Amino acid sequence: INSFHNMMDEINRLIDEVYVNKIALKEYELKALQAQINPHFLYNTLSMMNWMAIRSNQMEISKVTLALSTFYRTALSKGEDVVTVENCIQNMQAYLEIQLTMHDNNFTVDWDIDPTIKNEKMPKLLLQPVVENAIEHGIDEKEDGDKKIFLSFRGNGDDVVITVRDNGMGMPQEKAETLVTYQAKGYGLKNVNDRIRILYGENYGIRILSAPDEGTTVMMRFPKEGRKDEV
């Protein structure tokens, strides 16, 4: 688990460096990180850990190990910077499996997936900061009642719309709107918005709706394959 958090911290740190130094997107931080990881060694190690857990009848450990293996496989994605929506879904399913274990299953996750968009393309690891925010700044701060996260992957005309909604603490709408324009510590949503807009144009990006004690909704929009704004 610590290795997982360290990897995500390193990814987020390197994304910041990319924007500061104006490095081309195709050469951004994941290339450097992937060069340090031997996928075969990683997968073989996780496979061995899974076998040892099953042999010891530690099925919870086996479940987390398999989720971690899926997370790394979909995150590294054979060095590709652009992946399918299906890859993103698998990555988030594994990520949330790990988070649920870490949180003693004290929240639930609902999915709404349009199967017709699974082969559409998108930048990899685009959604992880959004879901992480829903957990850390949403449901983790909610003291009472059921804690829920909802993820939707839908087609909308020529676009793909991904929605992440939590029923956590929420925030004033004015603050929510600043998260996509200013680099707020611990959120990372500006980087997500910038990546989408640089790749696809200013008509795309993320929108946040929130209110105190009513949760937060983040909607991410990008074009289906082959479509983008004219520059």
Where are the predicted features?
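Two-component histidine phosphotransfer core
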Residues: 1-37, 41-209, 215-221
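Generic C-terminal helix-cap and adjacent flexible tail
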Residues: 224-231
